[in-house]
Curated annotation (Swiss-Prot):
Subcellular location: Secreted
Source organism of this protein record: Leptospira interrogans
Enzyme Commission code(s) on record: 3.1.4.12
Broad enzyme group: hydrolase
PANTHER family documented for this protein: SPHINGOMYELINASE C 1, SPHINGOMYELINASE FAMILY MEMBER
Protein name as catalogued: Sphingomyelinase C
Lineage: Bacteria, Pseudomonadati, Spirochaetota, Spirochaetia, Leptospirales
One Pfam family of this chain: Exo_endo_phos
SUPFAM superfamilies in UniProt: DNase I-like
GO molecular function: sphingomyelin phosphodiesterase activity
Gene from which this protein is expressed: sph
Signal sequence segment: 1-27
Length: 556
């Protein structure tokens, strides 16, 4: 009798959703939702209509099947021929113009080279790159992937040459192009660039943002892809640019409608859509674009200030967000399932720009879109490094070194009794280009707070009794600190280590010690000329497993 029990609730939900669609979508969009509302009447008991952003991640509850219960263009699971499936990747690669004031050189050329040689871009049918603004870096990227993806568009908004058509409001006086490029393994039969008539607000007004449209032929099957990067959530915009994004989404939808694409051909929209997953704006976006809610798997965010060093550099206090998507148009060919997988790879080799060393490809993580997972689909996080999130336990006191929970650059103290994010630190030997070495030995090391990325161990010399005490300093670690493995060989779990640094005043090296007594008891100091118990620490490697979503993927 459960059906009777929930009948009134479902009726109320459907009425509310109907009102929401009528308000949000406008009269010209209302007809698009008849099938959706009909399907909601028969929604199963375990459907989670009200999932939040975090609930949606990897759950598959509302996204394990297309939004329509029986879409007109759907087909049965496991009945898709290979040429009817497609694997598409979108990645905002953060290749800003090197001349951009306030941003400058973020290793654009080096990162483009790392992307070219990476594994994460392999085995796709189509890739949409966003923020490929910089001319030199973009050339490195496109030339480098050409052997696998020989069919390519130019970046949108740079020139009208080479396109079958240029639509929208193309501006010759724009400071920079639109940053979007599409590359394909399969022949591109048609390519159109559309520069948004809604040119946006804030910093976006200086670029020719819009979208690239391509029609590709994969073994006789036509696919239509729109790659885009819409208005950023800019503090210089009213309501963080919501109105501009709505107008730009409408331009995308109107373009799709104008193309009169056959209903049995698949239409995809991919890129950095700058809308937070699970928000009210997110559902409005799905409505305007007339796309299905995908099944989400992978990491919970595509722009993560807690795990990505570049994202954290400028926006440490901003919460992580899921902003990048690959959607399927509901008015066209419907696969039995559509999955979006957010992945967090790191470069196998580090890069250095203006003294800053990192292994990040970008400030965003890539997203894969596909019908069924296969052997090449990532099944776990790419961020499990041996010498990340290590902790140090004092041999003398049994307490752990920890950062401060309230202030990223407050003093380091050796007083933690339990393991937390504050007791975790990332080790990098910047002279070793291997981003994930299996064997780190004694030598110079950069020690970063796992809790506050880009804050590195340094010692204070600004007066007072705090002189020579250690604290995490933003983007400025001691470049002479060394880790000494007292047991010799590779650093392992349980290795006894000491730290040695150089005093620029006395021009002598000293060992770091746990201060004993007085107001500075348990603080970490550069002080001792010899090693005793208070200078020795046990190294503890992180034993927690990497995030694994293999059981949430759907395979053929």
């Amino acid at each position: 009798m459960r059906i009777k029990k929930y009948t009134k609730v479902r009726l109320l939900v459907n009425c509310c959703l109907l009102l929401f669609f009528l308000i949000d979508c406008g009269a010209d969009r209302q007809s698009l939702y008849k099938d959706l509302l009909a399907s909601l009447i028969y929604i199963s008991d375990n459907k989670n209509i009200g999932s939040t952003n975090s609930d949606l991640t990897g759950s598959g509850s509302v996204s394990s099947s297309p939004a329509d219960a029986a879409p007109e263009n759907s087909i049965l699971a496991n009945s898709i021929p290979e040429n009817m499936g497609i694997k598409i990747l979108t990645h905002n690669v953060f290749l800003l113009p090197k001349t951009l004031p306030g941003w400058g050189n973020w290793g654009q050329n080096e990162r483009a080279q790392r992307i070219v040689s990476s594994n994460y871009i392999q085995n796709q049918d189509v890739i949409v790159f966003d923020e490929a603004f910089d001319t030199d870096a973009r050339k490195i990227l496109l030339d480098g992937v050409r052997s696998e993806y020989p069919y390519q568009t130019d970046v949108i908004g740079r020139t009208k040459k080479g396109w079958d058509a240029t639509l929208g409001l193309y501006r010759t006086d724009a400071f920079t192009n639109g940053g979007v490029v599409i590359v394909s393994k399969w022949p591109i039969e048609e390519k159109i660039q559309h520069v948004f008539k809604e040119k946006g607000c804030g910093a976006d007004v200086f670029s020719n943002k819009g979208f690239a449209y391509v029609r590709i032929d994969k073994n006789g099957r036509k696919f239509h892809i729109i790659g885009t990067h819409v208005q950023a959530q800019d503090s210089g915009c009213a309501n963080l640019g919501v109105v501009s994004r709505v107008n730009q989404f409408n331009e995308i939808r109107d373009f799709i409608d104008s193309k009169k694409i056959p209903k049995n051909e698949m239409v995809l929209i991919a890129g950095d859509l700058n809308v937070i997953k699970g928000s009210r704006e997110y559902h409005q976006m799905l409505c305007i674009l007339n796309v299905n809610n995908p099944k989400y798997v992978g990491v919970p965010f595509t722009w993560d200030t807690k795990t990505n060093e570049i994202a954290a550099f400028y926006y440490k206090k901003v919460e992580p967000a899921y902003l990048d998507y690959i959607f399927v148009s509901k008015s066209h060919f419907q696969p039995p399932i559509w999955q979006n997988l957010a992945y967090d790879p790191i470069s196998a080799k580090t890069w250095t720009a203006k003294g800053y060393t990192s292994d990040e490809f970008s400030d965003h993580y890539p997203v894969y879109g596909f019908i069924y997972a296969d052997s090449s689909t990532p099944t776990k996080s790419g961020r499990k490094r041996k010498y990340d999130r290590v902790s140090f336990v004092s041999v003398a006191t049994g307490k752990k070194i920890q950062a401060n929970s309230e202030k990223s650059n407050a003093w380091l103290k050796v007083n933690a009794t339990t393991e937390t994010d504050l007791t975790k630190f990332n080790l990098v030997q910047t002279n070793d280009p291997d981003s994930n070495p299996s064997c780190m030995k004694s030598g110079h090391v950069r020690i970063e707070s796992s809790h506050s990325l880009n804050y590195f161990w340094n010692w204070w010399l600004g007066g007072g009794k705090g002189n020579y005490a250690y604290y995490p300093k933003f983007n400025d670690g001691s470049n002479r600190i060394q880790i000494i493995n007292l047991d010799g060989g590779c650093l392992q779990d349980g290795s006894r280590v000491a730290f040695k640094d150089y005093d620029t005043i006395s021009r002598r090296q000293y060992f770091l010690t746990v201060w004993e007594g007085g107001n500075w008891d348990k603080y970490l100091y550069l002080w001792r000329s010899h090693i005793g118990l208070r200078e020795i620490f046990y190294l503890k490697l992180d034993s927690s497993p990497e995030m694994n979503w293999s059981k949430k993927l759907i395979y053929r």
